[in-house]
Amino acid sequence: MMDQARSAFSTLFGGEPLSYTRFSLARQVDGDNSHVEMKLAADEEENVDNNMRDNGASVTKPKRFNGFICYGTIAIILFFLIGFMIGYLGYCKRVEAKSECERPAGTESLEVEGTEPSETEEYFPEAPSHLFWSDLKTMLSEKLSNTEFTSTIRQLNENSYFPREAGSQKDESLAFFIENRFRELQLSKAWHDEHFVKVQVKGSASNSVTIVGTNSGMVYLVESPEGYVAYSKAATVTGRLVHANFGTKKDFENLNSPVNGSLVIVRAGKITFAEKVANAESFNAIGVLIYMDQAKFPITNAEIPFFGHAHLGTGDPYTPGFPSFNHTQFPPSQSSGLPNIPVQTISRANAEKLFGNMEGDCPSAWETDSSCRLETSRNWNVKLSVNNVLKEIRIFNVFGVIKGFEEPDHYVVVGAQRDAWGPGAAKSSVGTALLLELARILSDMVLKGGFKPSRSIVFASWSAGDFGAVGATEWLEGYLSSLHLKAFTYINLDKAVLGTSNFKVSASPLLYSLIEKVMKDVKHPVTGQSLYRDSNWINKVEKFSLDNAAFPFLAYSGIPAVSFCFCEDTDYPYLGTTMDVYEKLIQKVPQLNKMARAAAEVAGQLIMKLTYDLELNLNYEMYNDKILSFVRDVSRFRADIKEMGLNLQWLYSARGDFFRATSRLTTDYRNAERTNRFIMRDINDRIMRVEYHFLSPYVSPRESPFRHIFWGTGSHTLSALLEHLKLRQENISAFNETLFRNQLALTTWTIQGAANALSGDIWDIDNEF
C-alpha cells in the first residue's frame, strides 16, 4: 500500500520520488539537531543513487525544479486561504464592535434608567445604512412640516410660566420643565448648572420723574414708572431737559444746545439702552430718560411701561471676567461698563407731558411725533430719582446634548433665552419653542432616522438674558478653558420671528459661505422664493448688538456665532413691554407657524451641515477680505504714519502671511486623504483656531472682556485704531501718538499670531516677519 501511495504522489508531482526524514518532535525543537538529521537523510539518498549506479541499473535522475513549483503553488494557495479567513473574521468583529459603539443617542440614557436591551432593540426601527445630505434635508423638512410651533409658543406663555423674570419661581419652573423635556426626548444627557448673580431691581422707594419750577419752586409729579432700567445708578438729579433724538454719538454731536450738566431724553430704538446712556455720559449729561415714540413704535396704548438695562457689556457686572459660581470668592469689583448717571424709562404719555413744558420743534429729519420738543424753558427743570437696588439671585442654565459619533468632543451650541421681564412671547418664547422642537426632531432623526452626526449638538436654555446675556456669559466665563477648540459654533435662536418681510443675519465671516448655502436651500414660507435674493447680502450683514447672546460667544470667547431673524423694516414694538403676549405676536405675524418652521429649517440645516461633513464648514478665507479692507483703510493715512517715523511694512507682511497660511491650509485639505481621521481632525483643529486667535492676547479679559480685534470693544480693536488715527487730522491735540504706536504694533502681532496658528505646527510656519 505504501509503495502504491508513493507511486501515485510521484506521478502527481512529475514522476519525482519523494524522500522524507525520520526524526522525533522532541529533537526538532532543539534546532541544530534537525539540520543534522536532514543532512543525513540527503546523504542516505545519495548513497542509494551511487549503489544503483554501481549495480549498472539505468535510472533517470528526477527533475526537482518541477517539484519546487508545485510546492510553491500549494503554499501560496494555503497562505491566501488563511489570510482570507483572518481578514473575514476580523471584519466581522469590527462590524459587531461598531454596531455596539454606534448606538442611537438615547440608548445611553435608556440603559442608565434600567431599560432592558431587548426593549431598546425593539423600540428603534432599522435605519438606512448611510444617509446623503439630500436625505437629511428631506427628512428635516418632512418632520418640520408636521410640527405645530404655535402650540408650543402658546404653552410657554400660559400663566404658569409668565411673567418669568430671571431668578423667579416661574423662571425656575420653566427651567426644570425644559430639562425634563430633554430627558423625555432621550438625548444623550440632560443637565443644568446654577449661578448666583447680582441684578438690579426696583427698590421699596419708587422711581419718579417730576417737573420743578426754577423760580416758584413748584413741583409737579409726572410719573412713578412701573418699568425701569437695570444697572442704572441709584441717584437723584435735577437739571434742564434736552432732546437728543436716538442718543447716538452723531445725534449728540449735531445738537445745537450743549448737554453738559443737563438731563437728556432720547427715543428707544436704533442702538441699545446701554449705548445711549454711555454716549450721554461721554457728553457730560447728568441723567437719561428713554421713551417709545409713536412714529417708530405705533402702539395705541400710550401708558405702556417697558424695561431694559444700562450695562455696556454682558454677564454679571459685579464679577467681570469671572464666573458667578456660589463657591467663588472674588474681591469686590465691578464692570467698567456700568453707568455713573441715573437712567429711567417713561411712557409716551408722560414724555408728551414733559414736551408740554419744552420749547423748539424737533428737526423734520428725525421723523418723529409732532409733539416732540427740543429743550425745557428757563422756568422749568426736571428732577429724576432712581432708587433701584441690587439683588442676588440664583439662575439656572439648562443643557441637553446629542453626542457625536466620530468627534464627540467637538460640538455646536444652539441656544435661546428663557426669561423675560414681561410675558416675553416674541422675546423668549419663540426661541425656546424652536430650541425644544429642534431637539425633538434631531433626536428623532438620530434614534429612528439613521442620522449619525460626526460632532455633538448641545442645546442650551439661558436665564437672565434680559439683564445682558448674563446666563450665557457666566457659562462662557466658567468653562472657557473647556470650550476652547471644542465649541466651534454658536447658533442663537432669540427673536428669530418678528415679522415676515425680511431675513436678516448677524454672523462671523467664517459662517458666511455656509449661511449662503442654507439660504439657497430654504424657501420663504410666504413668497415661496429662496431666502437668497441678493448676491451682495454679505455687505448687509449687521454687527452683533451688545444685547445679543451671540455677541459674547464671538467677542469674548472667539467662537464663531450666528443670529438671524425674520422681521420687518421697522422694530417689533412690543419687545421688553408688558404687551409682548402671544395674541399680539400672532396679530403681527399671522403666518407665525410657517415662519417658525422656516426659522427652524435654517437653524436645522446649519446644525446638520456643521456636524455632518468631515471638514468643518467654516470658511477661514473670508477673513482675508476683512484684513485687506482694514489695510486699505489704514493706508489712506500713510502720510500721517510716515510723519511719525512709522511705516506699514510689518502690517503688510502680517497680512501676506495670513493669506499664505489660508492658501496652504486649503491646499492641505484638497490633498488630504478623506478617510484618514487623524489628518482631517488636524485640519479641523487648525480651522477652529482662526476665530480664537483674533482675540487680542495683549489686553486683560477682566478689563477688556471683548478682546476680538474685529468685533470686540476697546482701544485694541481695528475700528478704535482707525478712529484714533482720524483724530490726528481732525483734532491733533486729542491724538495720542504713544497709544497709536501700541495699537499698530499689537494689531500687527495679533494678525501675525492668527496666521501662525493657522499654519499648524511650528515647523510648518514659514514667514520672514
Curated annotation (Swiss-Prot):
The YTRF endocytosis motif engages the clathrin-mediated endocytic machinery through adapter protein-2. It is a single-pass type II membrane protein. A motif (Stop-transfer sequence) lies at residues 61-64. The modification Phosphoserine is found at S10, S19, S24. Glycans are attached at T107, N260, N326, N731, N736. One of its GO terms (cellular component) is external side of plasma membrane. A motif (Cell attachment site) lies at residues 655-657. A lipid is attached at C70 (S-palmitoyl cysteine). Residues 1-70 are cytoplasmic. Cellular uptake of iron occurs via receptor-mediated endocytosis of ligand-occupied transferrin receptor into specialized endosomes. Endosomal acidification leads to iron release. The apotransferrin-receptor complex is then recycled to the cell surface with a return to neutral pH and the concomitant loss of affinity of apotransferrin for its receptor. Transferrin receptor is necessary for development of erythrocytes and the nervous system. Positively regulates T and B cell proliferation through iron uptake. This is Transferrin receptor protein 1. InterPro entries: PA_dom_sf, PA_domain, Peptidase_M28, Peptidase_M28B, TFR-like_dimer_dom, TFR-like_dimer_dom_sf, TfR1/2_PA. The modification Phosphothreonine is found at T21. It comes from the Eukaryota. It is found in: Cell membrane; Melanosome. Canine and feline parvoviruses bind human and feline transferrin receptors and use these receptors to enter and infect cells. The modification Phosphotyrosine is found at Y20.
